[in-house]
């Protein structure tokens, strides 16, 4: 039994015996016991398990986070999605982002709140730290949100418990936009707790508090105050936040600085915590009805007073814009209360009800401060006239970008480069590897201030070869040019034209050397302002368009670039509007004659000629409509400022080059004139490029095509007639665009064509060209050419462009078409070629006629008037003023240059031209000296902001009036045909500059000033043009003008006696460069054409027969003539320099005689230019402020700007071209000193004084030339090109400009570049640019103006197209 009990089977079998018999009852009882025990054990286990489970569940309820990975979280994850799931599953994951983001307090709260929100953040997550204030709704607390391990500070707005339902709704509605919208400039509402009372709003925390309080605290400690750039950025951010609200149909109920918060990283967020009523009680007027009215910020239309009670309506988008303007004002006043001197009642009465009280301009010194204030004023217009928040934001963004560009790139680099040593940039520049030249060129083109870049380690790339150091002294600005051969000399050996070999080469490369227009002309130009013979240092302007030659970009593209960039800011457009005109010279660097650049041409005399036509052709065709711009851009800039130097030298590389150059020049001149007309809104007379472009464009284009970078070459090669034209081109204001016509022609079409035809300037340029060509073709001694030039300039703004075509026949006396085709080749041989190279002779002749007629008809119109005024003024003044007129004539050329160049600084430059016109700008002084109406008008028209900051405004007026005069005068005055034709070109340049004035301000001025000159001379010129056009082959004057680059120049130079009646005395100003002999720059006293950069083309003429040896270089272009200046009898005629006419052109033509009256007038004017020699002008120029003061005529170069001797033979020029080591400033080179934007900040005031001083120069004999050269440039500052008698930039040595033949070979003899060298004493501008062309832009001011105009309007119209920046 015992065993059975222990046997496992016993329990079951024990009941039965082995036999199956039942066991004893005991076994049954034991079995039941076992079963009972078993069940009880099971139940116990189950119960225990249940108890354990229950206990566990209870624990979870109290410790939910322990179960974070449980089913609940899984469900949450599925509901919230992966991001939320991740956040929930990993409190760690959730916490980590918060922890990482905790550093930027401003943004962290937003993120943390969002994360908290995703995890259903509630009031239980909030930890109140302290109370920070109270509002109408209740209290405001600083709190902290804990999410896992991390915590984020937030602001909690708590609605009082006693709030009514209406207040509850208002409380929640106020936060709606901040909850719905997420933007970097809008305050973020992180959470809303409205399930129970009290209602809570969780807002992101901005540690620096409201912007008003921050600025006020900074004002106490000045060292802590934000810099102007930061304030500008803040203004843009405020506008951006408001714009975002408006885009989503929200309006701000109380927009003011106090309701803008500042994060730890100084980011502005529109929004508030409701503490304004408590913190800034004084900012509100509390009515009897307990209405809190922000009286000083509220728009007048929202407030009304009835029976002494204020009625306030809800805010609108328009009223928000008003408040935005006040907020920006408040920002720049560092939190000052608007109308601080007036009580609330006075503000209500005078500011709100009567709207007689306006906020003054903020005292804070800002870049483009006038433009900023202008935007504020836009915000305070009537509701229907106010801009939208989007428009305001666009304007502010543009200004901000421009300001940033100028301050960072231009201002700092400029200052480093302007330091007494100026070696800072130099070193860095030389350090730049040549291999990186192309890339650096592109970068430079993209940057606002390519030249400055070269000077600084950051951005000077290869262009750092040339460094111009400008030091401001009690006597003005001291310029010291230093050239480093290491950087780009070898890299770009195209044509010694480029100031810096590297830059020139780069430009050349960019320009598609040899066969097609350079595509990246702007880059090279920008970096090496000297394209070919025109090298300019541009410290300010930035390349408007990366695709354009920097110089061109500086010129023609500048406005456009600005527009295109509008703004890429500055660069700016904003690119560098300011600088773009300056860069306009750069295209010449490419070399109008050579695919590479003017350097090549100068160095390779032969390539230049063949290329000259070729580049011109491709360029022109590519930008048929833009052709004028592209063409005129570099040439115009080069010629007007240092056209002669740039153009002549560049154009003079070889006789062959001269021809093409002439053609290019003529074309450029025409183009430039057209552009000028376009820019001058009132110059409707000018026809569109097509009208004057038929054969002309074709020929020009062909020429350009022939010259790889014809446009660039043109600026160099032809007087650069191309420069003049480009400068006059509306785009000329964006000279860079035009200058790089070969590469940019496609991009510039709209600007160039439209502007050229529309503007009087274009006619003026054409005019100038025609008269010049006429003079050149008609005969060196035939005054008819000059009158014709004047007539054309005045009478046919549009015909001007056609004029080139006409001149082709006229110059050659052969069919225009053939001339046009062969003009480049012929030009060297005779004046006709110069014209021929300009345009297809056949079409141009008719075009010229039609141009003349249309010009005559339209000149009175606003646009034409610009051109006409400038042109006629130039001629009229010249003829009337005699010697004075000579200088005056030159001054107009300079003036035209200024017009081209100036946008913002143009005002100064305009004033200076005005002064120059009055005499200050002796070179183009005819308008100033004789009838200052054109120039003064330019100065007067448009307000200072526009003038100072808008290249369009200043240049257009100034250049227009001055340029036409300049062109006319040199032709008239300068005995040598070269100078006179240069004058014509100058006139064209003026027109080109007009485009800068094209801005609203410019247009008016142009219209007014143009009429002064235009009406008188208009008919005569028109008639002459028509006659010449009709007999295009015979018409020397007309043909010369069209082919004027050489023909006209030659004519002028060759016939100094007839042309230089009174001016001749001054003409004799010897200019070492001018004398540089082999070039055969006629020592013709040529009307200090060097003064007139546009005159640069004239050097071409010199090649023709003339008083001075034209054959050598036919480079009467500024440089050649200035070189002639070395020859006592060869006063540089800036205008002549501008026009690179062939010697053949010089030869007197019957047509020229027919136009004798006008021609004589023009001749006198031209003579005036000739008389005024860059050296003298520069030396004598006493313009207040930064005027380049040449110690002597020979010192025309800004101090040491002229490195090369005055006398430069073609061989020497060519040698220089090859070496590219010697840098010379030519007449075409101009230093623009702009007080406003430049470091010296003397833009506005100095300019006027410059004007005054300029007149003195005009009248003054020796210093006159320098003054004339710079006066026109007056706006352009002392550095105007060619401070020395040779008026060569130091680049001259590098570029054949000095020889003039290298670059201007086609235009003039190697000596011609010297003529171009006449240092145009730049008007005292704080900022400066050295550019061979007068069409340089003012980098800062110009950009500013451009930007402002782009933003504000006027500038945008012309030079200010942002284009800029």
From Swiss-Prot:
Autophosphorylated. Phosphorylated by CDK5. GO terms for biological process: apoptotic process; brain development; neuron apoptotic process. ATP binds at residues 132-140, 157. The active site is at 254 (proton acceptor). The modification Phosphoserine is found at residues 500, 1035, 1159, 1162, 1175, 1178, 1253. The modification Phosphothreonine is found at residue 1156. Signal peptide: none annotated. Residues 126-396 form the Protein kinase domain. Expressed in brain, and, to a lower extent, in kidney, heart, lung and skeletal muscle. In the brain, expressed in the olfactory bulb, cerebellum, striatum, hippocampal formation, thalamus, hypothalamus, and pontine nuclei (at protein level). Its EC number is 2.7.11.1. GO terms for cellular component: dendrite; endoplasmic reticulum; growth cone; membrane; perinuclear region of cytoplasm. Residues 1354-1365 have a biased composition (Gly residues). It is found in: Membrane; Cytoplasm; Cytoplasm, Perinuclear region; Cell projection, Dendrite. Residues 1015-1030 have a biased composition (Basic and acidic residues). SUPFAM superfamilies: Protein kinase-like (PK-like). CDD domains: PTKc_Aatyk1. Residues 638-655, 675-686, 904-918, 981-993, 1072-1083 have a biased composition (Low complexity). It is a single-pass type I membrane protein. The chain crosses the membrane at residues 32-52. Induction: Up-regulated during the apoptotic death of myeloid cells induced by cytokine withdrawal, such as IL3, and during G-CSF-induced terminal differentiation of myeloblasts to granulocytes. May be involved in neuronal differentiation. Belongs to the protein kinase superfamily. Tyr protein kinase family. Interacts with CDK5. PANTHER family: SERINE/THREONINE-PROTEIN KINASE LMTK1 (PTHR24417), SERINE_THREONINE-PROTEIN KINASE LMTK1 (PTHR24417:SF0). This is Serine/threonine-protein kinase LMTK1. The gene is Aatk.
């Amino acid at each position: 039994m015992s065993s059975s009990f222990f046997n496992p089977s016993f329990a079951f079998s024990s009941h039965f015996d082995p036999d199956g018999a039942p066991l004893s009852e005991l076994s049954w009882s034991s079995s039941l016991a076992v079963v009972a025990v078993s069940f009880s054990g099971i139940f116990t286990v189950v119960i225990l398990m249940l108890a354990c489970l229950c206990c566990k569940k209870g624990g979870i309820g109290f410790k939910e986070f322990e179960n974070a990975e449980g089913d609940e979280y899984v469900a949450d994850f599925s509901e919230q999605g992966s991001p939320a799931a991740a956040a929930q599953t990993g409190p760690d994951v959730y916490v980590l982002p918060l922890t990482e983001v905790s550093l930027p307090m401003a943004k962290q709260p937003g993120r943390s709140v969002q994360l908290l929100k995703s995890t259903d953040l509630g009031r239980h997550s909030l930890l109140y730290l302290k109370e920070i204030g109270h509002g109408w709704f209740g209290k405001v607390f600083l709190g902290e949100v804990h999410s896992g391990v991390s915590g984020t500070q937030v602001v909690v707005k708590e609605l009082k418990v006693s709030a009514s339902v209406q207040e509850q709704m208002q409380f929640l509605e106020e936060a709606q936009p901040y909850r719905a919208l997420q933007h970097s400039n809008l305050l973020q509402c992180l959470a809303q707790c409205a399930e129970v009372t009290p209602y809570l709003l969780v807002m992101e925390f901005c540690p620096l508090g409201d912007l008003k309080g921050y600025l006020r605290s900074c004002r106490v400690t000045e060292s802590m105050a934000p810099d102007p750039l930061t304030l500008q950025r803040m203004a843009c951010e405020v506008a951006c936040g408001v714009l975002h609200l408006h885009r989503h149909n929200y309006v701000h109920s109380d927009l003011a600085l106090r309701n803008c918060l500042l994060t730890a990283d100084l980011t502005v967020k529109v929004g508030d915590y409701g503490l304004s009523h408590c913190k800034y009680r004084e900012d509100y007027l509390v009515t009897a009805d307990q209405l809190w009215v922000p009286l000083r910020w509220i728009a007048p239309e929202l407030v009304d007073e009835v029976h002494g009670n204020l009625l306030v309506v809800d805010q609108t988008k328009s009223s928000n814009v008003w408040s935005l303007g006040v907020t920006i004002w408040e920002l720049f006043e560092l939190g000052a209360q608007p109308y601080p001197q007036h009580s609330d009642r006075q503000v209500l009465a005078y500011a709100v009800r009567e709207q007689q009280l306006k906020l003054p301009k903020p005292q804070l010194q800002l870049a483009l401060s006038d433009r900023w204030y202008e935007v504020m004023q836009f915000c305070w217009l009537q509701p229907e006239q106010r801009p939208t928040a989007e428009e305001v934001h666009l304007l502010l963004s543009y200004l901000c970008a421009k300001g940033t560009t100028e301050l960072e790139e231009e201002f700092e680099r400029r200052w480093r480069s302007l330091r007494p040593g100026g070696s800072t940039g130099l070193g860095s520049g030389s350090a730049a590897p040549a291999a990186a030249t192309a890339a650096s060129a592109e970068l430079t083109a993209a940057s606002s201030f390519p030249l400055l870049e070269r000077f600084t380690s950051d951005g000077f790339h290869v262009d750092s070869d040339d460094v111009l150091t400008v030091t401001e002294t009690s006597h003005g600005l001291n310029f010291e040019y230093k050239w480093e051969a290491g950087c780009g000399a070898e890299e770009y050996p195209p044509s010694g034209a480029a100031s810096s070999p590297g830059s020139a080469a780069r430009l050349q490369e960019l320009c598609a050397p040899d066969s097609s227009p350079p595509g990246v002309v702007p880059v090279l130009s920008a970096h090496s302002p000297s394209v070919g013979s025109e090298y300019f240092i541009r410290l300010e302007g930035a390349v408007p368009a990366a695709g354009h030659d920097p110089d061109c970009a500086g010129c023609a593209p500048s406005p456009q670039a600005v527009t295109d960039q509008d703004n890429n800011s500055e660069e700016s457009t904003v690119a560098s509007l300011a600088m773009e005109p300056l860069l306009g010279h750069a295209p010449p660097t490419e070399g109008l004659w050579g695919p590479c650049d003017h350097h090549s041409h100068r160095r390779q005399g032969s390539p230049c000629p063949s290329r000259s036509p070729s580049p011109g052709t491709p360029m022109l065709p590519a930008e048929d409509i833009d052709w004028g711009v592209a063409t005129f851009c570099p040439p115009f800039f080069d010629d007007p400022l240092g056209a002669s130097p740039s153009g002549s030298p560049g154009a003079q590389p070889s006789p062959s080059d001269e021809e093409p150059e002439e053609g290019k020049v003529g074309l450029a001149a025409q183009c430039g004139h057209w552009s000028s007309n376009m820019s001058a809104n009132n110059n409707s007379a000018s026809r569109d490029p097509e009208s004057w472009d038929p054969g002309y464009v074709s020929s020009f284009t062909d020429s350009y095509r022939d010259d790889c970078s014809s446009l660039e070459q043109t600026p160099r090669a032809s007087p650069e007639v191309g420069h003049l034209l480009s400068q006059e081109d509306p785009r000329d204001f964006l000279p860079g665009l035009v200058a790089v016509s070969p590469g940019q022609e496609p991009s510039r079409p709209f600007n160039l064509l439209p502007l050229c035809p529309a503007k009087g300037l274009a006619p003026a340029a054409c005019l100038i060209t025609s008269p010049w060509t006429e003079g050149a073709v008609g005969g060196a001694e035939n005054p008819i050419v000059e009158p014709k030039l004047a007539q054309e300039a005045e009478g046919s703004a549009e015909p001007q462009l056609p004029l080139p075509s006409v001149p082709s026949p006229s110059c050659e006396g052969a069919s225009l078409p053939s001339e046009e085709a062969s003009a480049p080749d012929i030009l060297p041989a005779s004046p006709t070629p110069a014209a021929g190279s300009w345009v297809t002779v056949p079409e141009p002749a008719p075009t010229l006629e039609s141009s003349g007629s249309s010009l005559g008809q339209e000149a009175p119109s606003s646009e034409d008037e610009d051109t006409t005024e400038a042109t006629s003024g130039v001629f009229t003044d010249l003829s009337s003023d005699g010697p004075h007129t000579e200088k005056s004539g030159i001054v107009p050329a300079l003036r035209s240059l200024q017009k081209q160049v100036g946008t913002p600084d143009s005002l100064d430059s305009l004033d200076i031209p005005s002064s120059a016109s009055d005499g200050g700008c002796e070179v183009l002084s005819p308008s100033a000296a004789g009838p200052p109406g054109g120039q003064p008008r330019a100065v007067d028209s448009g307000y200072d902001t526009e003038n100072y900051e808008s290249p369009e405004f200043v240049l257009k007026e100034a250049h227009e009036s001055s340029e036409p005069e300049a062109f006319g005068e040199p032709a008239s005055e300068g005995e040598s045909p070269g100078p006179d034709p240069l004058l014509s070109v100058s006139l064209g340049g003026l027109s080109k500059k007009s485009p800068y004035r094209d801005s609203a301000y410019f247009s008016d001025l142009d219209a007014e000033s143009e009429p002064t000159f235009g009406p008188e001379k208009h008919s005569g010129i028109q008639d002459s043009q028509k006659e010449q056009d009709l007999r295009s082959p015979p018409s020397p004057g007309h043909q010369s003008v069209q082919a004027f680059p050489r023909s006209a120049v030659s004519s002028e130079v060759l016939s100094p006696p007839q042309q230089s009646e009174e001016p001749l005395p001054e003409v004799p100003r010897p200019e070492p460069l001018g004398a540089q002999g082999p070039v055969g720059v006629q020592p013709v006293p040529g009307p200090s054409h060097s003064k007139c950069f546009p005159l640069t083309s004239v050097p071409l003429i010199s090649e023709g027969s003339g008083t001075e040896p034209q054959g050598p270089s036919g480079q009467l272009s500024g440089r050649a003539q200035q070189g002639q200046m070395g020859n006592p009898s060869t006063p540089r005629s800036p205008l002549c320099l501008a026009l690179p006419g062939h010697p053949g052109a010089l030869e007197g033509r019957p047509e020229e005689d027919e136009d004798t009256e006008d021609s004589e007038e023009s001749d006198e004017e031209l003579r005036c230019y000739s008389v005024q020699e860059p050296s003298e002008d520069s030396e004598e120029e006493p313009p207040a402020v930064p005027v380049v003061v040449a110690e002597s005529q020979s010192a025309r170069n800004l101090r040491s700007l002229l490195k090369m001797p005055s006398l430069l033979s073609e061989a020497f020029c060519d040698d220089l071209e090859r070496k590219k080591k010697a840098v010379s400033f030519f007449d075409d080179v101009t230093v623009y000193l702009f007080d406003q934007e430049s470091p010296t900040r003397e833009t506005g005031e100095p300019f006027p004084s410059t004007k005054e001083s300029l007149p003195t120069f005009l009248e003054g004999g020796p210093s006159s030339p320098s003054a004339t050269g710079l006066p026109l440039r007056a706006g352009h500052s002392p550095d105007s090109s060619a401070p020395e008698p040779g008026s060569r930039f130091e680049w001259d040595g590098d570029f054949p400009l000095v020889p003039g033949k290298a670059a201007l070979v086609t235009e003039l003899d190697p000596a011609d570049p010297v003529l171009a060298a006449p240092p145009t004493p730049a008007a005292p501008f704080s900022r400066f640019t050295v550019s061979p062309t007068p069409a340089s832009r003012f980098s800062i001011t110009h950009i500013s103006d451009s930007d402002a105009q782009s933003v504000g309007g006027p500038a945008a119209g012309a030079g200010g197209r942002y284009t800029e920046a």
